[in-house]
Design a protein with these regions (language model features):
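Active-site-proximal specificity loops/subdomain of glycosyltransferases
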Residues: 36-86, 91-106
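Short, well-formed alpha-helical segments that are part of the catalytic scaffolds
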Residues: 8-28, 41-49
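Conserved catalytic core of nucleotide-sugar-dependent glycosyltransferases
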Residues: 93-178
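Short, solvent-exposed loop/turn segments at secondary-structure junctions
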Residues: 11-13, 65, 89-91, 134-137, ...
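C-terminal catalytic/acceptor-binding lobe
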Residues: 1-4, 12-18, 168-169, 174-251
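A structural signal for short, well-ordered beta-strand segments and their strand-loop junctions
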Residues: 82-87, 127-132, 187-191, 231-234
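Hydrophobic targeting segments
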Residues: 2-8, 23, 31-35
Length: 251
């Protein structure tokens, strides 16, 4: 199997790197970890905090949002590279185990999940996969969805010319999935795995998520641009859901 690289898009969290801590606990090779920040101030603070000594590359390119930060990661690796993009606030990845969830703590089990995801993406001739969005075992299953949007907490892709929309400060992950589905017909979601993460906490992108007006505009934009894939969610204002039947849930 080709080597896998890990890209962490980080913002204003030099002293609170949960995802990096998690990768280190599992024994992930630091040379395979890339961290991207989007301001010179962040770059200096992260260097002072010693982050540069914990990753293979600490890179910086000016950016205004998480889309720019993710695109910096994509531009840092050659086409065809397997890149697992991660938010910086992940405590652990969890696996459905019976009626509950169990944290993945070993490198071997973590890579087993990644290998399965990449194999399914290749089977369906698409560029990537993600995990179940909500940490609730009741709604999860051991199967997968062939065609679904996924959240960017863990977003594993093969690098192509596809990029995140730099005008989107939120739901940029959904928009990328829609572009991939338009081009390839699929984007895989593993329904038996989910991230335990500290979403919407200080640092990161909490400012963008607190802008409710922008969330509504983004949802309308996505539903208007990809009406064959997404529709507004009437039960959750400011959110979207898959339009029509969801694609191909499989074991």
């Amino acid at each position: 199997m080709r080597e896998i690289y890990f890209g962490i898009a980080s913002y204003r969290r030099p002293d609170n790197q949960r995802t990096l801590d998690y990768l280190e606990r599992m024994g992930i090779d630091r040379e395979h970890i890339i961290m991207s920040v989007q301001s010179a101030e962040d770059k200096a603070q992260y260097e002072r905090a010693g982050i540069g000594n914990r990753v293979g590359r600490l890179i910086y390119r000016p950016g205004k949002n998480v889309s720019d930060n993710r695109n910096t990661l994509l531009e840092s690796v050659p086409p065809g590279t397997r890149l697992v993009m991660l938010d910086d606030d992940i405590n652990a990845v969890c696996k459905l185990d019976g009626k509950g969830l169990r944290k993945i703590e070993s490198r071997e089990e973590f890579y087993s999940m990644l290998k399965r995801g990449y194999a399914l993406a290749a089977r369906h001739r698409t560029v990537g996969f993600g995990l179940y969005p909500v940490k609730n075992a009741y709604f999860m299953s051991t199967g997968y969805a062939e065609r679904n949007v996924v959240i960017g907490t863990l977003f594993a892709i093969v690098n192509t010319d596809l990029r995140f929309d730099a005008e989107m400060a939120t739901k940029e992950d959904y928009e990328y999935c829609c572009k991939a589905m338009r081009r390839y017909g699929a984007f895989v979601r593993l329904n038996g795995y989910v991230c335990d993460a500290q979403h919407y906490t200080k640092g990161g992108c909490e400012e963008a998520w607190n802008d409710k007006a922008e969330l509504f505009r983004t949802a309308r934009r996505l539903a208007g641009k990809y009406p064959d894939i997404l529709t507004l969610n009437p039960k959750r204002p400011g959110e979207v859901k898959m339009a029509g039947k969801r694609g191909g849930k499989r074991k």
